[in-house]
Structure formats: structure tokens, C-alpha cells
Amino acid sequence: MEEPSGAQLLGPVEIRALAEKLDVTPTKKLGQNFVHDPNTVRRIVTAADLTPEDHVVEVGPGLGSLTLALVEKAASVTAVEIDPRLAAELPATFAWRAPGLADKLTVVQKDALKVQQSDFTTQPTALVANLPYNVSVPVLLHMLAEFPSITKVLVMVQLEVADRLAAVPGSKIYGVPSVKASFYGEVSKAGTIGKHVFWPAPQIESGLVKIIRTHTPWPQDDATRAKVWPVIDAAFLQRRKTLRAALSGHFGSASAAEEALRAADIDPQLRGERLDVADYVRLAGVIGS
């Protein structure tokens, strides 16, 4: 049955048929799990809060389950796919399942970790994706860094990763991904996805993470990240140590670390998990106390 907006979403039968046609076996190496449940796809798109003006980038479109639903809601979709067979088939899938929307799709066959602004004819305003699970955090952070135009994010990742990304200071799972994601804005968990909606079914559940990019007191540029990222990494490298000890290598000595911490109005006896991103930016000397 045709969707009211002009796209026929893919179900289990179509997913299997496409995979067989392309001789594609989902691989752990590429972190591939194909969503075959249209209701889950609709839920993801709804959670993304897209407008008809949004230009979406999707990383790892696979066979096109989510892609078909995204073009119904957005002005355009650029799908970044590393697998040449999958990338080549997407336009054909659109001709089959959404012929009236095919002109809204652009496919970029490339590793998402290497994708650049110059690969895009239209700069994206939203990232919506079922991210490859083995590189989900690096891909998420790369896309946020490379495309300042992205103002909203809705990604599906392993549930444990979703919990870590959305963790708040002071919690046991708060760490490097939590701080670096919050560098860009507000991070929250937007739901849990069961195993049964994927083929093949993964070992663990998945989670939805939402990020709304905000205007921060610090520049969200390469120069700022070059100062802040090493401080975050050092603070969590040995997370049971106090910041005075953990940052001694970064600042040259424990006393130098203590001096920097006190200058940033941070207790040197605290551990890294107690600081929010603004503390780390201040500690890196990007903004004043």
C-alpha cells in the first residue's frame, strides 16, 4: 500500500529481496544492521522534528529504509554510504519505491569519517541516521565538527552509547563522548529501540540520541577543539585520579595543573567526571572564569 506522501517504505520482505539482489550480507566490520520495520522508521523521523526546509544528511543509509521516510519530510537528503553496492542501488530503490521524490536524493559514496563540506552541493541542517555502531561516536563528532550548518541531530546508536552520550556530570557513565557531544549544545536521549526491528537482529538494544546545536559562549571551531579536546581526553584517561594528578602530564607538572585549575575556579581535588563542558572550555583557556 502506498504511503500518503508518496514513498513506499521497506518491510522485511523488500529488505531481504534487495540484500539478495545485491548479494549483500550485513557485516560487523561496517557495523551494518538494516532496519526492516516501517513503524520504527516513522518513529525516528518523527523524533527528528524535521521541517520542509531541512536539508538532511544521513550516514549509512544501507538499503534505504530510513532514507525513503526522510525525503517525505525534508527539502533534500544527502546519503553518505561507504559500500559501493549499496550506494549504487539507492537511486534505483527510489525509482521503485518513491519515483516522485527521487530528485530530492543525492548519494555520496564515501567513508563518513572523511566526508567534507566540498562533497555536498547543499550544506545539511540536520543529521538523521542509524549510525554504523562500530564508529558511531567518531562519525557523530566528525559530522558536527565538519558541518556547522547542522543544527539538529537524531541518531540511533547502541543503547550503552546512547546512555553515555546523554549522561550528565557526576554519573558513572559520564565520560569523553558525553563532554564532547555537549560542546555543541543540548544532548538528550529520545527513546529505546528493540532488537527485533533490525536484520540481522543485533545482540543489544539501541537508543535514540537527540542533539540541538546551541549558540555557546565559545567558538565551535577547529582552533577551540584543538585546545579543549586534549584536556578532556587527559582528564578521563585515568578517571579515578584527581584532576591535579590526571592533568599533570598535559600541563607539565602537578603544580602547573593545580595552578591552571585554580585559575579556572575548579577544585584540583575533583575528578574529571564532575566537570561540565563549560568547565573544560574554561580550563583550556578559551573563555575566562
Swiss-Prot record:
Catalytic reactions on record: adenosine(1518)/adenosine(1519) in 16S rRNA + 4 S-adenosyl-L-methionine = N(6)-dimethyladenosine(1518)/N(6)-dimethyladenosine(1519) in 16S rRNA + 4 S-adenosyl-L-homocysteine + 4 H(+)
Where it sits in the cell: the answer is:
Cytoplasm
Q: What is its main location?
A: cytoplasm
Against Gene3D superfamilies, the record matches this protein to: Ribosomal RNA adenine dimethylase-like, domain 2, Vaccinia Virus protein VP39
Provide this UniProt record's keywords sorted from A to Z: Cytoplasm, Methyltransferase, RNA-binding, rRNA processing, S-adenosyl-L-methionine, Transferase
GO cellular component annotations, sorted alphabetically?
A: cytosol
Q: What is its EC number?
A: 2.1.1.182
Cystine pairings recorded for this chain = none
- Give the top-rank taxon of the lineage listed in the UniProt record for this protein: Bacteria
EC class (word): transferase
| HAMAP family the UniProt entry points to | 16SrRNA_methyltr_A
The UniProt function text for this chain reads: Specifically dimethylates two adjacent adenosines (A1518 and A1519) in the loop of a conserved hairpin near the 3'-end of 16S rRNA in the 30S particle. May play a critical role in biogenesis of 30S subunits.
Name the record gives this protein? Ribosomal RNA small subunit methyltransferase A
Q: Which organism is it from?
A: Corynebacterium efficiens (strain DSM 44549 / YS-314 / AJ 12310 / JCM 11189 / NBRC 100395)
Organism placement in taxonomy: Bacteria, Bacillati, Actinomycetota, Actinomycetes, Mycobacteriales
What's the name of its gene?
rsmA
